[in-house]
Amino acid sequence: GKDALLGSLSFLFDEKYMELEAQLSDFATRYEQLIYLNQELFSMIENSISLDLLARLLSTQLITKGEKHLLDRNRYYYKLLRRIIREGQDGGEFRTDLSVNEMVKLYAIAERALLYDWCICNGEYSLKTYGSTAMPIYLAQIRIWDI
C-alpha cells in the first residue's frame, strides 16, 4: 500500500539518475556533474512530484522501524555518487582526507536537508533555484580549487 508507493518514489529518483547518467560526459568536472544531477533531480521533484507525497516519504523515514528507502546504500543513487566522487578524488578534484563514503554522505545529507526544508516551507520557493545556490556552497567544502 502506502509503503510501496513511498518506496517507489526512491525508485523513481533512481530511474531519473539512470537517465541523467548518459549526459554526465558533457561536463568537464565531477563537481559540475554533481551540480547537474542535483539540478535535474530537484527540477523533476518540483515539477512532477506532489509536495505531500515527498513530505510523507521524508516523514516515514523518520518514524519507520522498517525499510528506510532513502538510506538504502544499494540504491543506484549511492552507487553513482560513489563513482563520481571516487573519480573526483582520483583526478585531484576532491579532497582525499575524507573517504568517498563520507563525502557521499555529506552530499546526500545536503540534498535531504534542502528537500526537508522545501517541504516544511510548503514549497513556497523554487527548490531548483535554491539548490543552485546552496549545493555549490556545500560542495565547496569537498572541492580542491587549484585545479
Residue ranges and their predicted role:
Residues 15-18, 47, 65-91, 101-105, ...:
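Amphipathic alpha-helical packing segments from all-alpha helical-bundle domains
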Residues 35-36, 40-43, 79, 83-91, ...:
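C-terminal peripheral helix-coil segments that are non-catalytic and often amphipathic
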Residues 113-117:
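Structural signal for membrane-spanning alpha-helices in multi-pass inner-membrane proteins
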